[in-house]
Each structure stands twice: as C-alpha cells, then as structure tokens.
Design a protein with these regions (language model features):
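A short, Lys/Arg-rich alpha-helix, primarily the initiator
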Residues: 1-23, 70, 106
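Hydrophobic side chains within well-formed alpha-helices
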Residues: 9, 64-65
Length: 109
C-alpha cells in the first residue's frame, strides 16, 4: 500500500487540466457542459466526482472515465480509513444467529 494519501480528483482537475490551459471554473464548466457551481464544488473538494463528470472529463481530455472514478474511490476509501476506529461492527461469524441455523437457511429466510 502506498504511503501517499490519495488526492481529491477535483485537485487533479484544477491543477492538471484547468490551470495548464489557462482555464477558470467558468470556462471549464462551459466546455464540460456543467454548471459553474458543479465544477467549483468539485475543484474545491466540496463535492466528489460523479460517474457523469468522469465521462465528461474523459471525453474532454481523452483517457478513461474509469481512471477518474478510481481516483475518487481511492480518495473516498482513504477518508473512511482515517475514521475507521469509530466504525463499530460485530463480526458476522461471531453473531449467535449465524450459528443457530444451517448456512443455506440464512439466505433463504
């Protein structure tokens, strides 16, 4: 596992797509066919990358919509892992009900 923390896809859009081409949010939004607010929320990290935006970015820049979504997934997972100590669960294998019925019955109830 990499020790580098994943970058929010919006930062990638801003730093590697908009800025090098001298584009602001208004121009970028127009080219992508989205609202200024939608792109602003993405590049400032207030919103995540949607599958639709991933397709738009891939069409506008070339490349893969799946790669854009992988960036979002990596970022989201890293964010959840930061707070994983607050997530409390009971392992299913230790749950009493799991031992009281045959496995096949668990999924047919």
């Amino acid at each position: 596992m990499s020790s580098l923390y994943p970058i929010h896809p919006g930062v990638v859009v801003r730093e590697q797509c908009l800025n090098p081409h001298g584009l602001g949010v208004v121009e970028g939004a127009r080219l992508l066919g989205v609202s200024r607010q939608a792109l602003s929320n993405l590049v400032t990290g207030r919103a995540g990358l949607s599958p639709e935006m991933a397709v738009r970015l891939a069409k506008a820049l070339g490349g893969s919509d799946e790669r854009w979504m992988q960036l979002q997934f990596a970022y989201d997972l890293a964010e959840v892992r930061k707070k994983s100590h607050t997530i409390n669960v009971v392992p299913i294998t230790s749950y009493k009900y799991a031992h009281s019925k045959p496995q096949a019955e668990l999924f047919n109830s």
